[in-house]
């Protein structure tokens, strides 16, 4: 659908451009001028907590930004409550029903990404803001064990 295509194209706007930042959120339409600015990580629960690093997004913050921007500032999936809340706003589906725009999760909702397409062999590709790469990246589905369809989509 056009809606799904726009979600993926919006996600691709940040590919390779925004650092991973534990607790990083942004409800700014378009580029957030704070991205890349050294800031202290104030959210607890990470080895980076208390350190200063370039501001960016965490995994769920990336999802929030994508849906917020795609909807023109009208929609935040999970209302900013992190990957677990985002998962709660999805209907479980099977992997073979995956479509671009669906959300994928690590066990325990410890990480979230967006299905962005398929490679030439038909394997799912995921766009996500990854701490291991310190950026928005496209990878395969390694580590992702659950998939859900956001209720945002009308089909």
Task: Give the label of every model feature segment.
Residues 1-60, 65-73, 129:
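N-terminal capping segments
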Residues 23, 60, 79-80, 96:
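Surface-exposed loop/turn and secondary-structure junction residues enriched for glycine/proline
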Residues 24-26, 97, 140:
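Solvent-exposed, flexible loop/coil residues
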Residues 55, 96-97:
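Residue "hotspots" at secondary-structure boundaries inside conserved domains
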Residues 78-95, 108-155:
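Aromatic- and glycine-rich peptidoglycan recognition patches
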